[in-house]
């Protein structure tokens, strides 16, 4: 069942109310059986269906296993539509397995948030779901809580919105176990509120400070646990304050810090993060200052913990911590103060004790001394108060000794309280930074541990569970009060029930003081002498009599009944934990610390009255009471976080773990409380719109009705719907704005709606199926008509393919472009040679610059070494001074200590006096030594000043030398510029494209000059050297990037050149294809026009027939059924005719085969006669050639005669249509226009394609230009930064006098400056070495590239040799071709010998010569007419060129007018054809004996035809106007054919069209002859309709072709120009040396292409030879 009800509906879409739309099949399968949830030991619950019911026992099939359970142990399963609902309160059956199943489905689909009544459940995903971005946050700010998916942002936005609208404080309570995601959700809430209410324009905004407070809290308050790598070990309540809608401040309160973690942790856990971050930081000076020289394993408080967290860098986190402190205004000194306390705690833990005479003694005083120095307390006093404390006994103070164990406990207690107070101090400091004087509303975020039930629960768990008990009581009270308030506002009858005291007995049992509760008894035992945990447990057992409390004597524990279950608490160490004991003597010592920060840690103890003792439980109760009072003054929002599993895996949920947390969080209880009344609700308008389909009567509801005005009307309609579907009034309530339902009622209504919708859907499906059937039938009819048209077009295409002249044209056309390509190849080779010369010059210049750089780097290294020696010497002196100062400090401390001891006793005075004298002598000696050292220091300072002067002189010398080098380099660069300018002038004369490349190179050179000049000017000071080092590093990266860009551009340019070559070939092929299609379309157009003329003639004949059939109109109406039958018979007759034509084609094929057999026989006879006529070969050669010419002329004259006969046939058909001459002329012009329009459209398409390619190239150019611009901006930024450094240096020179006044401050900062310079020198040397290595690598690469170039030159030479060899082979092949021609002549001689035996043919030829002369005269007339046509076309081309501007203005008007005319003509033709077809069908279905009766019908039809003819004539006039405009468009197209090549192409196209028309005319005559016996007008008009449709389609195709051809011609020049510009830009950015390699590769590619062209030409010549052979065979056959 789970597979059917869960997985199948997982893809359903959400519906109102939270349901998921499921298929009818899934719903039906669910309804067939009674599905339930049965308990399981492994999975908690499994799904199954009831097989059998036996009283109270059910047999359930759980995945094929039959189990038996009582009815009270199983739970009903929710329908599939409620899977993955957003709110658990919407479930039809509320139970543990139902809630668990819904949460599991949502978790598996990445939905970790789910509403549960009025609060939000959040399950830890253990992975990044990318649902917390700024885009997601913005989406939730624009929506209300329940409009989008459940999310923590929705809760935060709801709180923010209510705060602004109601002016009421809000709170968000986030609870859950450790590792459930509380801290992460708290961070998300704070980030969301900071984004929504952040202020702009401030230097450090308050929202940024609030966000940066989190790393500080995590460092000092978070630690790694078994369940969580970043677990918060304290509770916090963050109040974010708002002034209006903007954040103005914040305040943080902390609860229940886990102090025991400071001194001990579990094996797989860590201490607080700050300890590991300090030990792992990179700041060695700081660690030295804190005396931290070890690793975590070297410290007692850390050695038993885990040292590292996977994927966490402690050093990086420490840097982030210090940055956050800086943002919050915590200064450097204050930061070090906090770090000193943390370090002191580590050192306190490392103090070792040993037993001596029954008392403890410190074994490692140095560690204790470090801790005391960090805390600024005296070591002796610390040891005294730790080991030998003074206790007041009566009026006297008695000193006693502590044992080793006691001392360790005191140290651990001191460490815990130090950390606790320090953490409080950190939070107070954060609050001081985030404080605001504005008083406004706030949003509080509570992050506190959730309810905990462990195997062993102690005092900490009681405090946590007590806190959650109070929060749960607060939740119950708030939630149900709010729910009942909604009922009151909606005017629903309701008896108010107070649920606020449900948990009060347990709370009183813990906290109440009268009668005494558990915590009160604990406080009482803490102040009683000799009290233990057993006495505490005995008091509880004796005095507490409550059903919620139970004592376990065996295990020293008691059981307490909480809202989430019974919890057993063990009382081990409760007294010590509640006392939180520590040494008052040590606390007072810390209060007297010399460090202000340390002394402030215990100031709060001074405010406590003497003798007043406050336990941990009392403090916690006070804090919790304050928190609860704070929450009661706010409007709360609840978030419960849940751990899915213990493996930290985001793949599955552990049912047992999740159920346990649901119980602890009180999820089910909360849902049940929210469902006591009417949990399901829906607005009246929404309810009516969704469920009005269930009404029997139609309800007219206008969507534009205002909901507020028509609320009563919606309410009334909703009541009618509920009463009509049979819902009892006890199951719902009609409120003022909403309708409320009991549990499960809305699910039942939804089921009824699904049934109704399924019925309606079935009716709709039936209608759709009927419509689809009709559509399918109509498509079959149209498909049959299309098949007929395709058959006819296919036959015409086959005829064209068999035409020999067309084949010859296709073979010869590619040979015309070979000569152009040779010229282009020569130009490219010249460019390659020029670039090679430029590359050589650039290489020589580069080598000179590299030599200069080497010399400069050597001098710089010497200077740096000298500076480094001086710095080392000064550092040694400073260290010596520090040692002397340290000794003097120690001496002073000893002196002070001695002076104090003098006044302690009279008996030791003499001894101390002698010791004082000794010390005085030592002091004098040390004073003298100090004076001596001071003199040495002064001498060293003098030497240091002298060395500084020397360094200044050395710097000046370096600057002068560098300036000389600059001048030399500039001179070389000027010479280089002059050479470049000369090269530019030469290249400019040859090619403008190369000039642009050289200009780009010149710009790059100027930029390089400026960069070098700026760099050398800034090397005068140490700061300039540092800037130079950084710039060199950045330039190194830029060089690497430019090198990568160059390689990418090189590859890209190569690919583009190859693509251009391929594209060029493709364009040539497309041009040939277009010309072929254009000729084919022209022939088809002519044929269609002729067919149309023929059919119009047939139409005129039909008009006469209609006059004879006038009286049969009424009788025809009764013959409709017969007409259908006759239509079918007509189709059958057409099919029979088609079969007859196919048989005729077969017969022609048979005839062709017989002719081929005869040809073979003749060839065999020719071979036999070859030996006989060999003697007569030379004598008859001339005669045979003459006769061959005669035969060709006869053949040509015969063809011309056929054409003349065809033209005469056309004239006769035109004479028959004298009344429609104008119409025919207009139609001819239309066809011509359509042909040119098609050509125009084709040109437009090609132009678009080429423009698209051009746009791609432009995009590439834009990208490259942007990269160049970026590099220029980087150079400009470097220039500005260096100018600023220069200005700063000038200011520094002006401040030299002030430097003398602050010489002492400079000496104090000398150490830091020396360290910085030393680090800079090391970094500079490393970068310089890297730069040298890069230069060396560049040289090696240049050498390798030169070798590659030499190898390429060798390959070029070899290829040249191969080309010469191929040329020789070609010449040899040409000689073979000449030999073949000779053989061909021999064959022709054989033909002449064969003709001597065909005397009868010669006589026939002589008889036909006179006829041929007549034909030749007619052909000459046709030639004259054709020449006149060509002249006319040329004149039209000239006229159209002049009208180019006018065409551009009226092209759009012409197209719109043409489209209108075409549409009108097409409509009229369709009407005309439809009517003609109808009449023709009626006539053909009648019998000949009824002709007289149909005369009236024919008269009426003739009248209608006359009217139609008049309408058609009017439309033809409109066509003529459109055609005049189209002729202008045609002329504009011809304007682009300026060259002689294009004019010759047009002439050849016209010739091919004329010949094609003649062939089409002959084919038409044959078809007309075959169909002349048919008298079926229906066939005529059917073909007329089909031909008109084909004509329209062909016209549109020709228009598209014409437009595309025009666009292609216009865009060829543009794309060529753009490609050239792109190549110029690319070449300008590529290094000259590597460009030579690229050009060599291009040259090789061109040569390979040339070889390919030569091979193709050779193959074409072979094809020509074969063609002439076949032509000779044809001639032989004719002879």
Curated annotation (Swiss-Prot):
Region called Disordered, residue ranges: 1-22
Keywords: Actin-binding, ATP-binding, Coiled coil, Motor protein, Myosin, Nucleotide-binding
Region entry Actin-binding, spans: 624-646
Entry keyword Protein transport: no
GO process annotations (BP): actin filament organization
Family label: Belongs to the TRAFAC class myosin-kinesin ATPase superfamily. Myosin family.
Protein name: Probable myosin heavy chain ECU04_1000
Organism: Encephalitozoon cuniculi (strain GB-M1) (Microsporidian parasite)
């Amino acid at each position: 069942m789970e597979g059917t009800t869960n997985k199948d509906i997982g893809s359903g879409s959400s519906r109102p109310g939270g349901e998921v739309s499921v298929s009818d099949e899934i719903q039906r399968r669910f309804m067939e059986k009674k599905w339930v949830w049965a308990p399981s030991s492994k999975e908690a619950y499994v799904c199954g269906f009831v097989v059998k019911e036996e009283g109270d026992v059910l047999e359930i099939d759980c995945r094929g296993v039959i189990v038996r359970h009582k009815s009270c142990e199983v739970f009903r399963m929710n329908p599939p539509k409620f899977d993955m609902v957003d709110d658990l309160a919407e479930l039809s059956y509320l139970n543990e397995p139902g809630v668990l199943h819904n949460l599991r489905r949502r978790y598996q689909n990445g939905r970790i948030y789910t509403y549960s009544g009025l609060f939000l459940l959040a399950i830890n995903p253990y992975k990044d779901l990318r649902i917390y971005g700024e885009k997601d946050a913005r989406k939730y700010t624009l929506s209300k809580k329940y409009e989008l998916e459940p999310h923590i942002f929705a809760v935060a936005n709801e709180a923010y919105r209510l705060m602004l609208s109601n002016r009421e404080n809000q709170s968000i309570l986030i609870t859950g176990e450790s590792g459930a995601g509380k801290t992460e959700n708290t961070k998300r809430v704070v980030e969301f509120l900071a984004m929504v209410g952040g202020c702009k324009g401030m230097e450090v905004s308050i929202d940024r400070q609030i966000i940066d407070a989190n790393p500080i809290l995590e460092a000092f308050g978070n630690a790694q646990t078994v369940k969580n790598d970043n677990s918060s070990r304290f509770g916090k309540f963050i109040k974010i304050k708002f002034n209006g809608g903007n954040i103005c401040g914040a305040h943080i309160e902390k609860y229940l810090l886990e102090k025991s973690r400071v001194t001990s942790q579990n094996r797989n856990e860590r201490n607080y993060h700050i300890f590991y971050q300090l030990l792992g930081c990179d700041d060695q000076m700081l660690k030295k200052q804190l005396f931290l020289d070890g690793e975590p394993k070297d410290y007692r408080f850390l050695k038993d913990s885990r040292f590292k967290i996977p994927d966490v860098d402690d050093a990086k986190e420490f840097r982030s911590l210090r940055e956050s402190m800086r943002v919050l205004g915590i200064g450097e000194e204050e930061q070090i103060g906090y770090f000193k306390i943390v370090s002191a705690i580590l050192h306190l833990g490392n103090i070792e004790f040993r037993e001596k005479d029954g008392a403890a003694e410190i074994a490692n005083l140095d560690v204790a001394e470090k801790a005391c120095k960090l805390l600024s307390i005296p070591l002796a006093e610390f040891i005294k108060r730790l080991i030998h404390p003074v206790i007041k006994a009566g009026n006297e103070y008695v000193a006693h000794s502590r044992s080793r164990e006691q001392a360790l406990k005191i140290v651990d207690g001191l460490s815990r309280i130090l950390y606790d107070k320090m953490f409080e101090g950190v939070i107070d400091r954060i609050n001081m930074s985030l404080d605001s004087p504005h008083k406004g509303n706030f949003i509080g975020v509570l992050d506190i541990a959730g309810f905990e039930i462990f195997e062993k629960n102690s005092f900490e768990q009681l405090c946590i569970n007590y806190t959650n008990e109070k929060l749960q009581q607060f939740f119950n009270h708030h939630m149900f009060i709010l729910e009942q308030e909604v009922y009151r506002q909606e005017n629903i009858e309701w008896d108010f029930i107070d649920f606020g005291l449900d948990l009060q007995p347990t709370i009183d049992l813990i906290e109440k003081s009268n009668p005494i509760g558990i915590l009160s008894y604990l406080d009482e035992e803490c102040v009683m002498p000799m009290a233990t945990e057993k006495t505490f447990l005995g008091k509880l057992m004796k005095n507490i009599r409550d059903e919620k409390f139970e004592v376990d004597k065996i295990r020293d524990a008691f059981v307490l009944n909480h809202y989430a279950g019974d919890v057993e608490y063990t009382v081990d160490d409760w007294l010590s934990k509640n006392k939180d004991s520590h040494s008052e003597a040590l606390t007072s010592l810390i209060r007297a610390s010399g460090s202000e920060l340390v002394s402030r840690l215990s100031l709060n103890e001074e405010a406590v009255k003497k003798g007043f003792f406050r336990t941990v439980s009392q403090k916690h109760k006070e804090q919790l009471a304050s928190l609860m009072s704070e929450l009661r003054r706010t409007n709360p929002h609840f978030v419960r976080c849940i751990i899915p599993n213990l493996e930290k895996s985001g793949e599955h949920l552990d049912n047992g773990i999740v159920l346990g947390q649901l119980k602890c969080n009180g999820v089910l209880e909360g849902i049940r409380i929210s469902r006591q009344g009417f949990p399901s609700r829906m607005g009246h308008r929404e309810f009516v719109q969704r469920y009005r389909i269930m009404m029997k009567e139609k309800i007219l509801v206008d969507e534009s009705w205002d909901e507020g005005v028509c609320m009563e009307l919606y309410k009334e309609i909703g009541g009618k719907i509920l009463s009509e579907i049979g819902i009892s009034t006890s199951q719902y309530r009609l409120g003022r704005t909403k309708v409320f339902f009991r549990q499960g009622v809305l699910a039942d209504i939804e089921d009824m709606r699904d049934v109704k919708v399924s019925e309606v859907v079935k009716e709709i499906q039936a209608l759709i199926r009927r419509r689809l059937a009709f559509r399918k039938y109509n498509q079959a009819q149209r498909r049959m008509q299309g098949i007929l048209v395709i058959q006819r077009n296919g036959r015409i295409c086959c005829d064209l393919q068999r035409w020999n002249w067309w084949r010859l044209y296709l073979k010869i056309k590619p040979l015309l472009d070979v000569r152009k390509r040779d010229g282009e190849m020569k130009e490219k080779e010249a460019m390659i040679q020029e670039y090679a010369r430029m590359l050589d010059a650039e290489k020589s210049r580069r080598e000179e610059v590299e030599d200069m750089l080497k010399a400069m780097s050597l001098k710089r290294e010497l200077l740096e070494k000298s500076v480094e020696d001086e710095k080392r010497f000064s550092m040694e002196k400073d260290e010596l001074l520090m040692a002397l100062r340290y000794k003097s400090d120690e001496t002073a401390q000893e002196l002070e200590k001695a002076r104090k001891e003098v006044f302690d006793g009279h008996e030791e005075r003499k001894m101390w006096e002698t010791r004082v004298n000794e010390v005085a002598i030592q002091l004098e000696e040390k004073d003298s030594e100090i004076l001596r050292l001071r003199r040495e220091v002064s001498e060293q300072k003098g030497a240091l000043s002298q060395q500084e002067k020397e360094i200044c002189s050395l710097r000046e010398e370096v600057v002068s030398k560098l300036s000389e080098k600059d001048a030399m380099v500039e001179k070389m660069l000027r010479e280089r510029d002059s050479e470049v300018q000369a090269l530019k002038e030469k290249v400019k004369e040859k090619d403008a494209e190369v000039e642009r490349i050289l200009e780009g190179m010149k710009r790059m050179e100027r930029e390089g000059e400026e960069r070098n000049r700026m760099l050398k000017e800034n090397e005068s000071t140490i700061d300039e050297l540092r800037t130079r080092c950084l710039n060199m590093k950045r330039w190194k990266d830029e060089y690497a990037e430019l090198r990568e860009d160059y390689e990418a551009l090189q590859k890209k340019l190569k690919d583009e050149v190859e693509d251009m070559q391929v594209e060029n070939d493709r364009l040539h092929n497309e041009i040939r294809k277009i010309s072929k299609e254009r000729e084919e379309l022209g022939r088809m157009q002519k044929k269609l026009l002729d067919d149309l003329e023929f059919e119009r003639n047939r139409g005129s004949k039909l008009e006469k027939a209609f006059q004879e059939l006038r009286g049969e109109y009424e009788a025809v109406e009764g013959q409709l059924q017969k007409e259908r039958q006759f239509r079918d018979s007509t189709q059958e007759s057409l099919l029979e005719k088609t079969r007859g034509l196919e048989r005729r084609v077969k017969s022609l094929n048979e005839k062709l085969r017989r002719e081929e057999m005869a040809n073979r026989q003749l060839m065999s006879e020719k071979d036999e006669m070859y030996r006989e006529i060999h003697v007569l070969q030379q004598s008859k050669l001339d005669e045979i050639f003459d006769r061959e010419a005669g035969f060709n002329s006869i053949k040509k004259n015969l063809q011309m005669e056929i054409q003349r006969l065809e033209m005469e046939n056309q004239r006769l058909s035109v004479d028959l249509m004298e009344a429609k001459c104008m119409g025919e002329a207009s139609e001819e012009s239309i066809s011509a226009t359509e042909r040119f329009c098609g050509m125009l459209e084709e040109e437009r398409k090609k132009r678009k394609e080429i423009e698209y390619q051009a746009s791609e190239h432009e995009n590439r150019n834009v990208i490259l230009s942007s990269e160049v611009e970026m590099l220029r901006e980087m150079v400009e930024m470097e220039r500005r930064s260096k100018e600023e450094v220069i200005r700063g240096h000038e200011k520094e020179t002006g401040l030299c006098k002030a430097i003398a006044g602050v010489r002492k401050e400079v000496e104090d900062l000398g150490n830091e400056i020396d360290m910085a310079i030393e680090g800079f020198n090391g970094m500079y040397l490393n970068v310089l070495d890297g730069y040298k290595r890069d230069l060396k690598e560049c040289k090696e690469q240049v050498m390798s590239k030169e070798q590659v170039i030499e190898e390429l030159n060798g390959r070029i030479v070899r290829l040249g040799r191969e080309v010469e060899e191929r040329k020789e082979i070609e010449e040899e092949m040409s000689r073979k071709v000449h030999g073949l021609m000779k053989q061909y002549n021999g064959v022709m001689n054989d033909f002449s010998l064969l003709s001597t035996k065909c005397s009868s043919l010669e006589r026939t030829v002589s008889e036909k010569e006179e006829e041929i002369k007549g034909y030749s005269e007619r052909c000459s007339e046709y030639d004259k007419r054709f020449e006149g046509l060509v002249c006319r076309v040329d004149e039209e081309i000239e006229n159209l060129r002049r009208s180019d501007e006018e065409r551009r203005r009226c092209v759009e008007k012409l197209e719109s007018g043409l489209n209108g005319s075409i549409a009108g003509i097409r409509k009229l033709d369709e009407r005309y054809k439809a009517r003609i077809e109808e009449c023709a069908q009626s006539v053909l279905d009648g019998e000949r004996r009824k002709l007289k009766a149909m005369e009236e019908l024919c008269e009426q039809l003739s009248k209608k035809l006359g009217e139609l003819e008049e309408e058609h004539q009017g439309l033809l006039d409109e066509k003529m106007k459109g055609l005049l405009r189209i002729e202008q468009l045609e002329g504009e197209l011809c304007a682009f054919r300026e060259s002689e090549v294009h004019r010759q192409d047009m002439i050849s196209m016209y010739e091919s069209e004329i010949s094609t028309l003649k062939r089409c005319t002959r084919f038409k005559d044959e078809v007309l002859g075959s169909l002349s016996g048919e008298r079926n007008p229906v066939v005529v008009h059917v073909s007329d309709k089909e031909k008109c449709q084909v004509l329209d389609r062909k016209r549109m195709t020709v228009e598209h072709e014409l437009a595309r051809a025009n666009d292609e011609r216009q865009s060829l020049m543009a794309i060529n120009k753009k490609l050239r510009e792109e190549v110029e830009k690319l070449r300008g950015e590529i290094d000259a040396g590597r460009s030579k390699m690229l050009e060599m590769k291009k040259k090789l590619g061109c040569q390979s292409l040339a070889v390919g062209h030569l091979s193709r030409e050779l193959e074409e010549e072979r094809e020509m030879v074969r063609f002439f052979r076949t032509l000779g065979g044809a001639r032989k056959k004719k002879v």
